[in-house]
Amino acid sequence: MDANERKALISRYRDGHRAIVKALEGLREEELDRSASDEWTPRMIAHHLADSEMTSAIRLRRLVAEDGPVISGYDEAQFAKKLTTDRPIEPSLEAMRWARESTAQILERLTEEDWLRAGTHSERGPYSVEDWLTIYANHGHDHAKQIERSRGRS
């Protein structure tokens, strides 16, 4: 991956929060708990993104700061099932926003050597900083599309 590709992915990563906020815009409280078919509800997605952002932010920091870290997976479905219920989504959206902004600032300052750093993901195997960026650059946008489906927009 070259510097221009990384820059584009960092921009997309940073934009993920905006995409989520736009997808949620205008939803009434009761609509936060409706989903398209068997997908997560918008409320579950908002809370999942906060959990995911906090987890992924630490993963990236470990990849950059530690030599060959083991990056632990977690059971996203259980987090969604047990931790989302009826909580307001605003704190989770703020957690997502701040975790992404802080992490984007780190990404923008990585050296070529930093981009080559890697560890081992407990579920995926070899896991590099570039792998991390490729996954999380699209994560918010993918869930924004899921919210749009719950609204019947796609």
Regions found by a protein language model. Give the residues of each.
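General structural signal for secondary-structure boundaries
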Residues: D2-A8, A19, L27-R28, Y74-D75, ...
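Alpha-helical bundle segments that constitute or directly flank the non-heme di-iron/ferroxidase center
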Residues: D2-E29, D51-I58, R62, I135-N138
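Amphipathic, non-membrane alpha-helical segments in soluble helical-bundle scaffolds
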Residues: A3-R14, E39-A46, I89-L93, E130-L133
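Solvent-exposed interaction patches of small proteins and small membrane subunits
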Residues: N4-R12, R34, E66-P69, L83-R87, ...
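Acidic/histidine-rich alpha-helical segments that form the ligand environment
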Residues: R12, G16, A23, A80-R117, ...
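Short, contiguous alpha-helical
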Residues: E31-A77, A104, E112-S154
